[in-house]
Amino acid sequence: MPLHIVDKHKSLYDNYVQSATTEEIAKFKLADDPNEPETIKKLIMDELLLDGNSKQNLATFCQTDLDKNIHSIMDKCIDKNMIDKDEYPQSAEIENRCLHILADLWNAPDSSDTIGCSTTGSSEAAMLGGLALKWNWRENRKKLGLPYDKPNIVTGPVQICWHKFALYFDIEIREIPMENGRYVMNSEEVLKRVDENTIGVIPTLGVTFTLQYEDVFSISNALDKFEKESGINIPIHVDAASGGFVAPFIQQEIIWDFRLPRVKSINASGHKFGLSPLGVGWVVWREKKDLHKDLVFNVNYLGGNMSTFSLNFSRPGGQIIAQYYNFLRHGRNGYTLIQDACAQQGIFIGKELKKMGIFDLIYDGTGALPGVCWTISKNLPSEPLFNLYDLSEKLRSRGWQVASYSLPSSMNDVVVSRVVIRHGFSRDLSSLFVKDVQNAIEYFQKHPILRSLEKDEGENFHH
């Protein structure tokens, strides 16, 4: 073993006189020798300064404003593995409480008779909901002696997890394209696409592209009528990744959840408007019978018998405990105050953007998710001196991260920008953002762009 002379005086003096910081470190392979932990921590934290400021990240749906108690909970739970329910029985009990709270929040007919599970996020939760649809449809087809080799789902413009689900599990996705003036699915378009092989219809409560809600109520009514005429019973799974923690508090008049008998399952993201740290999603079934028993595995090699349904295995427990903390801390009234405050900022920004006379609002912040979505008006007297990719790039120089992207499929020629308003975004910040947008427009007027950014250069669509 080689001997190394350590200059203790230098190592104790300053992090920035040690070799780990004065020389190039190994970045793509494991170094031979260890380093002082504080020096390496400092080096990494310096690199992370190049990341964007999360408070100004208006592109993400994920929660970035977390109180000190959540940080403490996450620290205390860093070693808890949620799959080890026999070793961490109280953590498992807390997970169970969260599921029943959600079942009650989403108006399950009997929240004590429902079933569900936590996940790493709403994408995994959505896939589990989709798998349950497939298994139930396949069993029904087998009982009737009918073929079951061509399952399909009918969706609006969905988040990419549904395309992954369709590809990974060999299911046809019938995605209803947007049209000018219609950016979400509606019941008429659904009925054009459903048939005996449709395992489920997947409306989204908060479409990623525009923040709008799809009308679960009218879709359910249309499927009721379709069943009376055809005898084909098609269930609904609601992708409420964002809206599942918004609509129950500030849009209670919207009927989208288990109040509709056709809604068999709902997924949501705890780390979006559920106010929890990254890494927790939820899926809840209307009744236990809606989750096919063949999808549930029973394992006993962790010290006790337990049931599991997931696409992974080991998972940290801190996010689930933090979700429970949020439920207890905020309650219904607290969540209502928070989500309404977010919604008001979105409405304010929408009104201010409209006043500028250059933008058309696709979504003005009312009636769905907190935020706003806009495009450059096509009715301007002359061509604008910039595009939305240019605007996003200019705003980035002030620290703002704004998602700009083209809409999918048949609306691909329409470029939009979107901001999502999350807990922790004040009216003061909203006003500063609007001012920076106005300043950017004035800058482009004084300094015309010779070549605007193209889609592949400027698109920054954050799911």
Curated annotation (Swiss-Prot):
Gene Ontology terms: biological process: aggregation involved in sorocarp development; glutamate catabolic process
Entry binding sites for pyridoxal 5'-phosphate: 122-123, 208, 271
Binding residues for substrate: 60, 81
SUPFAM superfamilies for this protein: PLP-dependent transferases
Keywords recorded for this protein, A-Z: Lyase, Pyridoxal phosphate
Reactions catalysed according to its record: L-glutamate + H(+) = 4-aminobutanoate + CO2
Cofactors required: pyridoxal 5'-phosphate
InterPro entries: Glutamate_decarboxylase (IPR010107), PyrdxlP-dep_de-COase (IPR002129), PyrdxlP-dep_Trfase (IPR015424), PyrdxlP-dep_Trfase_major (IPR015421)
PANTHER family given in the database record: GLUTAMATE DECARBOXYLASE
Subunit structure, interactors included: Homohexamer.
UniProt-recorded name of the protein: Glutamate decarboxylase B
Lineage: Eukaryota, Amoebozoa, Evosea, Eumycetozoa, Dictyostelia
Gene coding for it: gadB
